[in-house]
Amino acid sequence: MAKIKKGDLVVVISGNRDDRGKQGRVLEVLTDSNRVVVEGVRRVKKHTKVSQTQRGSRTGGIETIEAPIHVSNVMLVDPETKKGTRVGYRTEEVERNGRARTVRVRVAKRSGKDV
């Protein structure tokens, strides 16, 4: 189970001086390279070649996109204190369709609340 998932609110704890301390939602998790794309963090300019589409309109130019950052440089935001926190797990017994199942739940270490 991943500690950081798509849609989580995270804070940047290290890296670029301009991005450090910023909070944003995780847009994408790249599990193969241990990186995440965070909304509004590490914005880079991408130069795209001018090309023609099927309808005849031209695309291309300079666009600003979010680049991935390493997962160790972000920390989950505690839903109660709104500060960065580590993530732990708690196992719970849940009954589904008449059968008992063991489920792992993510827990904020700072407040002990479910994430």
UniProtKB/Swiss-Prot annotation:
Summary of subunit composition and partner proteins: Part of the 50S ribosomal subunit.
Leader sequence residues: none
GO biological process: one example: translation
Cited PANTHER family: MITOCHONDRIAL RIBOSOMAL PROTEIN L24
GO molecular-function term, one example from the UniProt record: structural constituent of ribosome
Similarity annotation: Belongs to the universal ribosomal protein uL24 family.
NCBIfam families, per database record: rplX_bact (TIGR01079)
Key words of the record: Ribonucleoprotein, Ribosomal protein, RNA-binding, rRNA-binding
Name the UniProt record assigns to this protein: Large ribosomal subunit protein uL24
Gene name tied to this protein: rplX
Function recorded in the entry: One of two assembly initiator proteins, it binds directly to the 5'-end of the 23S rRNA, where it nucleates assembly of the 50S subunit. One of the proteins that surrounds the polypeptide exit tunnel on the outside of the subunit.
Lineage, opening ranks: Bacteria, Bacillati, Actinomycetota, Actinomycetes, Micrococcales
GO cellular component, one term: ribosome
